[in-house]
């Protein structure tokens, strides 16, 4: 509802964030339609943001080649605005992992179709992207885990074992993490709220700065992303 009002005001933020919400909910058709409305507006959303979300949606729809082109656009396309703002998304290991995963999807699809040449090509492309991630973040769990799959399918067992052990070494201790997290979340309610993957910020609440204690409680959801993209 909040994003619908933003869209009515003529801002691309409205349909763009609606697309993000729909995507998080698994409504891919709704996400596609909302994103199309966003890119049709003037001004348009940043091209790298719309390309990233388009890639996410396309991958979930099984359009892996489309996803690859969109993720490559985020990482490599140079635009006047991007250069002016000095954005370098080539260091964004989240998007690079997504690109590698899309290549891996293509490799698995080629394998199912008994296309060995295509399978090997896409496995090597996936390998390249995941190894680039490790030059940025040597402890990246997603890259190590996916490289296990890549090397297993390439038949290079020693490399698969190397990344298997690295994944075990760098994987957080979930039990220890939960023991530390629960008391902290109970002690700091505001931090607990902000730590959720989808954060619901109360627009009006008792005790809020500038509002009377009897202020009615209203809320709107804002989805947060661990990503360099705005």
Which role fits each region the language model picked out?
Residues 7-9, 41-43, 77, 88, ...:
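Structural marker of alpha-solenoid helical repeat scaffolds
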Residues 11-13, 45-47, 81, 92, ...:
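Residue-level recognition of tetratricopeptide repeat
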Residues 71-76, 141, 148-176:
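TPR/TPR-like (Sel1-like) alpha-helical repeat modules
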């Amino acid at each position: 509802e909040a994003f619908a009002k933003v869209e009515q005001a003529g801002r691309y933020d409205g349909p763009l964030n609606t697309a993000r919400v729909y995507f998080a909910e698994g409504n891919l058709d709704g996400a596609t339609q909302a994103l199309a409305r966003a890119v049709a507006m003037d001004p348009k959303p940043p091209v790298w943001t719309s390309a990233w979300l388009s890639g996410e949606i396309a991958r979930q729809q099984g359009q892996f080649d489309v996803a690859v082109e969109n993720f490559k656009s985020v990482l490599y396309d140079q635009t006047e605005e991007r250069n002016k703002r000095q954005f370098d998304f080539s260091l964004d290991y989240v998007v690079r992992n997504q690109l590698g995963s899309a290549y891996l999807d293509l490799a698995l699809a080629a394998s199912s179709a008994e296309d060995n040449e295509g399978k090997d090509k896409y496995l090597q492309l996936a390998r390249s992207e995941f190894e680039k991630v490790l030059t940025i973040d040597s402890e990246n769990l997603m890259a190590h885990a996916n490289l296990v799959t890549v090397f297993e399918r390439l038949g290079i067992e020693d490399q698969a074992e190397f990344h298997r052990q690295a994944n075990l070494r760098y994987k957080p201790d979930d039990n220890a993490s939960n023991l530390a997290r629960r008391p902290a979340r109970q002690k700091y309610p505001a931090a607990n709220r902000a730590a959720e993957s989808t954060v619901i910020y109360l627009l009006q609440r008792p005790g809020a700065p500038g509002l009377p204690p009897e202020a009615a409680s209203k809320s709107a959801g804002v989805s947060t992303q661990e990503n360099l993209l705005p």
